[in-house]
Amino acid sequence: MFKKILVPTDGSPLATQAAMEGIELAKKIGAEVVCVYVAKENQNSEFEFSDGKPQSWPTAKEYEEAVNHAAEQFMQPLRESAEAGNVKFTSETFISNTTAGYIVYAAEKNGCDLIYMASRGYTGWENFFMGGVASKVLAASQIPVLVYKVKKEQVPKKAKTYISPRI
């Protein structure tokens, strides 16, 4: 059976729901959990103006701190759920525009033998059957992937829009 399960999250309600189910599976079979959050790279290609003056962009260090803070907020309920079930929980955060690649990389690096992920995250119903990240992970991974299919009625009607962490 599985000994170490990777559960990626993007902080969306759907990814969080899938991660919680992955933690429940780990609890039932006595596995560890590795939680991964991959944030988009800081995109400073466009200027935003306020009162006719360009707004300041975060430095690389500020952006990394903001990403780590956001990741901790996303992972805290997952960590608490794992700890309540006596499941060993570790986490990693990456900054990259290749989310699927880093999910697979983290699973391999941490010796995971299962990736348990949502069928979609913040992209919502953009890809009707399965989200783009889930599809790419399935295509790239040599490790088994369990895709948690969210039922249509479970999708929030007015989901919050995700915005990359900014200072």
What are these regions (language model features)?
Residues 42-43, 99, 124, 155:
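Generic structural signal for helix capping and beta-alpha/helix-loop junctions
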Residues 80-115, 152-156, 161-167:
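Structural beta-alpha unit
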Residues 114-140, 154-156:
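Glycine-rich, Arg-bearing micro-motifs that act as flexible, cationic patches
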Residues 21, 67-78, 102-104:
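Short, solvent-exposed amphipathic alpha-helices that sit
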Residues 3-57, 81-85, 90, 153, ...:
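Small/aliphatic-rich secondary-structure junction motif
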Residues 55-73:
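A short acidic, glycine-rich active-site loop
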Residues 18, 45-48, 101-104, 128, ...:
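Short, well-ordered secondary-structure micro-motifs
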